[in-house]
């Protein structure tokens, strides 16, 4: 039965949607700072991790590269922020006070230290880390260079791009010249002129364009 359905799909006139692979590719070397510190013998994820960056913003769902022993960083929060639902195999010893009956010596009750309930071992609810400050992401290996690269990228992003003023095209200059030649300074008439103002530009827009045209040295030329 399944084979017959497969044959029917193969005979279907609907073409299968095929995505071009190049449409999904990204250029990791688009930035000069990243390109200068890129290592060709490492993968994209390895390079980004070393530079203190991330290749994806979504949560990791699996298939990540396992780190070698000793490469775990104390400053890394990747494992600290993970919530494990599994029951721990080894329980850490804790201290508690015991109240006994003075006559029989039997234990009446056990008094534990006041501590918030944390059955899922959520580090965000842990009292042990309340006094610790955030120490940043990433590995200790190459942390100095990573911080320098991140600082350079942040400085580059903070610099405002050079703003270039829009230049009027030749056709726009000719259009403004026709308006000024016919109506002079009467901007209201320019707005109502359906022949010279078919796009229904507003009075303030035409006034701004005319002023910019005059500042650039625009003058009405006499017809030959």
Curated annotation (Swiss-Prot):
Residues 148-173 have a biased composition (Basic and acidic residues). GO terms for biological process: ribosomal large subunit biogenesis; rRNA processing. Residues 125-142 have a biased composition (Acidic residues). Residues 8-25 have a biased composition (Basic residues). Involved in the biogenesis of the 60S ribosomal subunit. Belongs to the NOP16 family. This is Nucleolar protein 16. It comes from Botryotinia fuckeliana (strain B05.10). The gene is nop16.
């Amino acid at each position: 039965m399944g084979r017959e359905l497969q044959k029917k799909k193969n005979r279907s006139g609907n073409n299968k949607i095929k995505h071009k692979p190049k449409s999904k590719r990204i250029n990791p070397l688009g930035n000069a700072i990243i390109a200068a510190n890129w290592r060709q013998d490492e993968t994209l994820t390895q390079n980004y991790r070393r530079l203190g960056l991330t290749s994806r913003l979504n949560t990791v769902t699996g298939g990540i590269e396992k780190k070698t022993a000793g490469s775990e960083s104390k400053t890394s929060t990747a494992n600290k922020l993970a919530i494990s639902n599994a029951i721990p195999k080894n329980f850490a010893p804790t201290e508690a006070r015991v109240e006994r009956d003075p006559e029989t010596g039997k234990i009446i009750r056990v008094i534990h230290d006041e501590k918030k309930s944390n059955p899922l071992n959520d580090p965000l609810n842990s009292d042990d880390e309340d006094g610790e400050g955030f120490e940043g992401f990433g590995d200790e290996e190459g942390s100095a260079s990573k911080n320098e690269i991140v600082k350079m990228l942040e400085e580059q992003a903070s610099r405002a791009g050079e703003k270039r003023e829009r230049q009027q095209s030749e056709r726009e200059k000719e259009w403004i010249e026709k308006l000024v030649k016919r109506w002079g300074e009467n901007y209201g008439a320019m707005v109502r002129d359906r022949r010279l103002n078919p796009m229904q530009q507003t009075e303030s827009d035409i006034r701004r364009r005319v002023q910019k045209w005059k500042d650039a040295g625009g003058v009405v030329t006499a017809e030959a």
